[in-house]
């Protein structure tokens, strides 16, 4: 069995741990410097269609629909005078199972850590 140490329990570290976890030949440990995972409610993230495609490899399809939003367009505004510049129809980039998505960072972290119990070691400095 190969041992893998992942430094950081952020979105990327938790995602790659989920990928490695699929292979029983790997023993994974995630080292996080903070004493707990940052689950502040206020931060939002936007996930492109390509991001959703790779998240689907670890079961993102089963993520609760009431915790995510799939907008149909993005509006762009001038920073100088707040006038709308244009909008972008993002549904053109979507497929049936991969849609541009927004959600709380804390919701994504909770999803990513669900199957990693016992693998995350907090309070470690490298």
How would you label these PLM feature ranges?
Residues 1-12:
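Beta1/beta-strand and adjacent pyrophosphate-binding region of the FAD-binding site
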Residues 19-41:
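Glycine-rich FAD pyrophosphate-binding loop
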């Amino acid at each position: 069995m190969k041992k893998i140490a992942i430094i950081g329990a952020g979105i990327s570290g938790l995602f790659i741990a989920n990928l490695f976890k699929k292979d029983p030949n790997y023993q994974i440990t995630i080292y996080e410097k903070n004493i707990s995972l940052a689950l502040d409610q206020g931060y939002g993230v936007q996930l492109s269609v390509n991001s959703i495609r790779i998240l689907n490899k670890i079961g993102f399809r089963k993520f609760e629909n009431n915790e995510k939003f799939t907008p149909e367009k993005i509006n762009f505004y001038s920073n100088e005078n707040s006038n709308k510049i244009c909008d972008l129809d993002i549904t053109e980039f979507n497929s049936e199972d991969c849609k541009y998505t927004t959600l709380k960072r804390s919701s994504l972290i909770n999803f990513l850590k669900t199957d990693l119990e016992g693998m995350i070691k907090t309070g470690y400095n490298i």
